[in-house]
From Swiss-Prot:
Outcome recorded upon mutating residue 490 to A: Does not impair homodimerization and formation of higher order oligomers
Catalytic activity, as annotated: GTP + H2O = GDP + phosphate + H(+)
Gene this chain is encoded by: DNM1L
Sites bearing S-nitrosocysteine, chain numbering: 644
Gene3D superfamilies for this protein: Dynamin, middle domain, P-loop containing nucleotide triphosphate hydrolases
Transmembrane segments: none
Record protein name field: Dynamin-1-like protein
Protein's organism: Homo sapiens (Human)
Entry-linked InterPro entries: Dynamin, Dynamin_GTPase, Dynamin_GTPase_CS, Dynamin_N, Dynamin_stalk, G_DYNAMIN_dom, GED, GED_dom
Activity modulation comment: GTPase activity is increased by binding to phospholipid membranes.
Outcome of mutating residue 218 to A: Abolishes GTP hydrolysis
Length: 736
């Protein structure tokens, strides 16, 4: 047991440097009602008169008292400074820094002064603790907490809810699972009414860390004793019940020493409780508390060891990120540049050490831009967006010039499809911009997660960011130009012989043929019946032949009628061809879109002159040929509908081919001219711009507080390693 005292003391000192909030050691918390003898028990354990005593409420602030065992031979006690003190026992307050107290009357007075400074001088209570450490060869290594006694009625400056405030204060200390509760109860009160045991059971229902102390054994009524209570027959306590005899107020007034009090206590126990004398008393209480503390520490060692290891790993990682002081600046600069370039490329490739889990980044995000954002944007572009029937008809008529069109002009198709292809340029350039932005974000990602060493050198970090940003900025116009050229290439030559386009035209031809057959099935019988009704016995030719010029000249009013029909056709926008004539619409696609024989027969039938009576003067109207034709809302003729349908299908077919090409070629161009180029030239660009002897000192200048943070991390790591070593020593002792 004695061998463990210096080890436990070292452990306590080490964790005092770490901080009690980081690692909480087991401590003894004294609770009880007001004037039950809590402070007297503490004084007996310390062996000195150091706590304020009196009637009523005396302890008005929590007192954290740490007892530190020192050897008898060590007469000169120092604090690590030049000044020391020649004494066997001394105390030190946390709020007075390094000031030492050898007179325990001064310690008691300082406690009173510090209490009044915070709590006032009229029985006020404060939750702010007083920290006191006592060094003595007469104590074992214990940490004790003296708390204000529980009360019911407020007095002096105490608030109305003083009972609730003190209760919450006590619960805050005893709720710590690493604490041992010392429940103090006066022997001259009923054990069943003990407030200390009641509040202890609230946080420790199993009684695994509660020790009962019975005070004032010498003040019981004549003829009674505490034998049943001390034996645990009234209320059993798992850790035991220990009786003690405190000094009375008369003994204190007479300056009776603690040593004399302990001697008289032993004599009293031998006389009144001879069978229990060796298991009661202040000395036995001290040994029991020490044993409980040791076992409690043993139970907490695994958790303490784990927490120390976690903290040590954190501070080791932090210290590594701070790095060692730079000796070879040239090698350090080259190493940092190379590491950044490698991490940047690895982030793009997806092999980086630190992989983001909350969102896509690096190469994965670039892939998403190519195949999701850019792909969906292109697919959302309507092949016929911005075109209507009037636009198509106008383009067809403008492409024919002054000549009537026999076929749909190919130039009208090219004009319209180029207009649609041009719409693919804007989303393509936007794709380049998104990839450029993502490569900018990769710079920050590498700085924050991958190469934390750069945080040591803020100027180097800024310089690297500037060089990479400039490199990306230089590649942006080149990439945009290439993407622009890809669209321009598609606009430069409309390849109507493209295999996919020919296949589409073949499918379209089959569809149109089917529609024509359906239309012919409806119109051919009516044309034949009309031909039979218009025959003259011997004057007209067969219906299958065209009328001769002589026959046309003989028809009454034919010239006037033809002129009127032409005029009417021009005014109605028929393109110089009669509405009823079904002309082939192949233009330069004759081999793709063919006219059936049946349709040619129907065209011949419709081209035959139909005798018409001379126009009535009252129904005629004048036509001004100098007027500019204006669009007229009307129903499209069959030919116009067919021409628009053909152009729309051809535009859609060719647009889909071009869109597929753009969707495939733009990501390739971006990868070659931007992404891969930056990957290949990044390190050489960084070395060329930054690896210069004139820039070494400036770039490798650490931030002002880096040295201080490195020292603090090293000190904390050393303290944690010392604590880990002490725990290992405790485990190796025979006690465990």
């Amino acid at each position: 047991m004695e061998a463990l005292i210096p080890v436990i003391n070292k452990l306590q000192d080490v964790f005092n440097t770490v901080g009690a909030d980081i690692i909480q050691l087991p401590q003894i918390v004294v609770v009880g009602t007001q004037s039950s003898g809590k402070s007297s028990v503490l004084e007996s354990l310390v062996g000195r008169d150091l706590l304020p005593r009196g009637t009523g409420i005396v302890t008005r602030r929590p007192l954290i008292l740490q007892l530190v065992h020192v050897s008898q031979e060590d007469k000169r006690k120092t604090t690590g400074e030049e000044n020391g003190v020649e004494a066997e026992e001394w105390g030190k307050f946390l709020h007075t820094k390094n000031k030492l107290y050898t007179d325990f009357d001064e310690i008691r007075q300082e406690i009173e002064n510090e209490t009044e400074r915070i709590s006032g001088n009229n029985k006020g209570v404060s939750p702010e603790p007083i920290h006191l450490k006592i060094f003595s060869p007469n104590v074992v290594n214990l940490t004790l907490v003296d708390l204000p006694g529980m009360t019911k009625v407020p007095v002096g400056d105490q608030p109305k809810d003083i009972e609730l405030q003190i209760r919450e204060l006590i619960l805050r200390f005893i709720s710590n699972p690493n604490s041992i509760i010392l429940a103090v109860t006066a022997a001259n009160t009923d054990m069943a009414t003990s407030e200390a045991l009641k509040i202890s059971r609230e946080v420790d229902p199993d009684g695994r860390r509660t020790l009962a102390v019975i005070t004032k054994l010498d003040l019981m009524d004549a003829g009674t004793d505490a034998m049943d209570v001390l034996m645990g027959r009234v209320i059993p306590v798992k850790l035991g019940i220990i009786g003690v005899v405190n000094r009375s107020q008369l003994d204190i007034n007479n300056k009776k020493s603690v040593t004399d009090s302990i001697r008289d206590e032993y004599a009293f126990l031998q006389k009144k409780y001879p069978s229990l004398a060796n298991r009661n008393g202040t000395k036995y209480l001290a040994r029991t508390l020490n044993r409980l503390l040791m076992h409690h520490i043993r139970d907490c060692l695994p958790e303490l060891k784990t927490r120390i290891n976690v903290l040590a790993a954190q501070y080791q990682s932090l210290l590594n990120s701070y790095g060692e002081p730079v000796d070879d600046k040239s090698a350090t600069l080259l190493q940092l540049i190379t590491k950044f370039a490698t991490e940047y490329c690895n982030t793009i490739e997806g092999t980086a050490k630190y992989i983001e889990t909350s969102e896509l980044c690096g190469g994965a995000r670039i892939c998403y831009i190519f195949h999701e954002t850019f792909g969906r944007t292109l697919e959302s572009v309507d092949p016929l967006g911005g075109l209507n029937t009037i636009d198509i008809l106008t383009a067809i008529r403008n492409a024919t010039g002054p000549r009537p069109a026999l076929f749909v002009p190919e130039v009208s198709f090219e004009l319209l499809v180029k207009r649609q292809i041009k719409r693919l340029e804007e989303p393509s350039l936007r794709c380049v911009e998104l990839v450029h932005e993502e490569m900018q974000r990769i710079i920050q990602h590498c700085s924050n997660y991958s190469t934390q060493e750069l945080l040591r050198f803020p100027k180097l970090h800024d310089a690297i960011v500037e060089v990479v940003t400039c490199l990306l900025r230089k590649r942006l116009p080149v990439t945009n130009e290439m993407v622009h050229n890809l669209v321009a290439i598609e606009l430069a030559y409309i390849n109507t012989k493209h295999p996919d386009f020919a296949d589409a035209c073949g499918l379209m031809n089959n569809n149109i043929e089917e529609q024509r057959r359906n239309r012919l099935a409806r119109e051919l019988p009516s044309a034949v019946s009309r031909d039979k009704s218009s025959k003259v016995p011997s004057a007209l030719a067969p219906a299958s032949q065209e009328p001769s010029p002589a026959a046309s000249a003989e028809a009454d009013g034919k010239l006037i009628q033809d002129s009127r029909r032409e005029t009417k056709n021009v005014a109605s926008g028929g393109g110089g061809v009669g509405d009823g004539v079904q002309e082939p619409t192949t233009g330069n696609w004759r081999g793709m879109l063919k006219t059936s024989k049946a349709e040619e027969l129907l065209a011949e039938e419709k081209s035959k002159p139909i005798p018409i009576m001379p126009a009535s003067p009252q129904k005629g109207h004048a036509v001004n040929l100098l007027d500019v034709p204006v669009p007229v809302a009307r129903k499209l003729s069959a030919r116009e509908q067919r021409d628009c349908e053909v152009i729309e299908r051809l535009i859609k077919s060719y647009f889909l081919i071009v869109r597929k090409n753009i969707q495939d070629s733009v990501p390739k161009a971006v990868m070659h001219f931007l992404v891969n180029h930056v990957k290949d030239t990044l390190q050489s660009e960084l070395v060329g711009q930054l690896y210069k002897s004139s820039l070494l000192d400036d770039l490798l200048t650490e931030s002002e507080d880096m040295a201080q943070r490195r020292k603090e991390a090293a000190d904390m790591l050393k303290a944690l390693q010392g604590a880990s070593q002490i725990i290992a020593e405790i485990r190796e002792t025979h006690l465990w």
